[in-house]
Swiss-Prot record:
Na(+) is not transported, but it plays an essential structural role and its presence is essential for fluoride channel function. GO terms for cellular component: plasma membrane. The lineage of its organism: Bacteria, Bacillati, Bacillota, Bacilli, Bacillales. Belongs to the fluoride channel Fluc/FEX (TC 1.A.43) family. Na(+) binds at residues 74, 77. The gene is fluC2. The chain crosses the membrane at residues 19-39, 95-115. This is Fluoride-specific ion channel FluC 2. Its main location: membrane. Keywords: Cell membrane, Ion channel, Ion transport, Membrane, Metal-binding, Sodium, Transmembrane, Transmembrane helix, Transport. One of its GO terms (biological process) is cellular detoxification of fluoride. It comes from Geobacillus kaustophilus (strain HTA426). GO terms for molecular function: fluoride channel activity; metal ion binding.
Amino acid sequence: MVYLAVGIAGMIGALVRYGLGLVVPAAAVGGFPLGTLFINWTGSFLLSWFTVMFTRRPAWPPWLKTAVTTGFVGSYTTFSTLSVECVELMEQGRFGMAAVYIAASLFGGLLASWAGYAAAQPERKEGIG
């Protein structure tokens, strides 16, 4: 069951990534790989959010967590494309842009992950008076 769920979720994640890559082409922003950056940032957010949600809901089946985190989010995000795009930028002599891309990917991903974690926390109500 878990293999099928991971496969189906992985297919969906890959298709969503492909579709977003078509919507945000790199050429539209001076060759900066904004599409991959956006995908990896949102994937970092989603992985943290889902991780917290599954931890807080132990009744949810374990296969669902694996399908969502490893299948969907794992196929949606892409470290290999990040790496290839950095190499391509460096081969074009755009070392500064490659460095910005690496830094934005790392620090933006960490920030997005923190935001996903924070967004999944229970809402805290302030007392009156």
